[in-house]
Amino acid sequence: MAYHKLDKKKYAAEQKEKLDELHARITEIGEGFNLSPETLADYYSFAGRFYQYSPRNNMLIYDQNKHATFCGSYKYYQDQGYSVKAGEHGLKILVPVTTTLFKVSENEWKKVSEATKEEKEKLKRKEFETRMVQNYKIGSVFDISQTTIPPEEYPKFYSVGYKSEQHATIFEGVKNYCENELNCPVKMANLHSIGLQGHYLPFENKIELNEILEDSKKLEIALHEMGHAIMHSDVFKELPREQIEFEADSIGLMFSSHFGFDFAETQKFHLAQQYRAMKEGNEEAVENNKKEPFDVNKILNNVSETYFEHIEKLSDYVNVSLLKDKVSTCLL
């Protein structure tokens, strides 16, 4: 179908309006966490499953379908030999698009795709200054439940969690990751307390876990303390205590979600409590001209991006640990 120049302008204006709406919705979601921090735990549980998407797209998918478990494009499912069911509507996301521009005059740049025949010849001869810019367009993805993939094959596409009897083996993978990748030893110790389950020692870059912990709790606490080691080994003195705890809670919950943990109400309460304390501390600092105003999206993005940087390699360590355990069990 051919489009007239006026149609193209109209289409571009409509697309920009839709993009602006998505960007505004992302901001609204972040502001919603300000009003109800308890919902953050549900978001982190969700985001822990979607490390292949950017934090902003995670928010958009979460906003449109909080029960999504695995998403892919229409083409992705086709490439796997399946299809999206008829009548299903996609979930809108932001898709990065790189555009090459060339300099026409001092104050004017033009898309290479819109170059005239003469300009294309000059471009071949490299007579124009060029640069690349990144913009976004609207794309669609579909949850696996919207496709023809049978439920029994879902585990081929995403992890459905681990059995509790595997937690000790998963812990060994987490421990090896901390020690080999973060240079952070993980030790079981007598902490002379029943209530203290573990702590991160920033000046030694070391994790100590209470030796009385059973396997599942030991793994859960290790993931939280690993969050400190990842996010705070260099900035422990610079950040408020409430922010340090909130960030460790946040990334720890994302790791826990990835490994199949359900969140206890006490964890959700603690996360919301730390969030409110962090926000109140920031408001006080702003009043005293010591800080910039609090930006929830900035903190959420930092936590999510840090999680994305580590989860694949951490999963590799865990899988190696599980494989070793399986081999040793077969040899018995």
Could you describe each region identified by the protein language model?
Residues 1-332:
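N-terminal accessory/interface modules of nucleic-acid-binding and processing proteins
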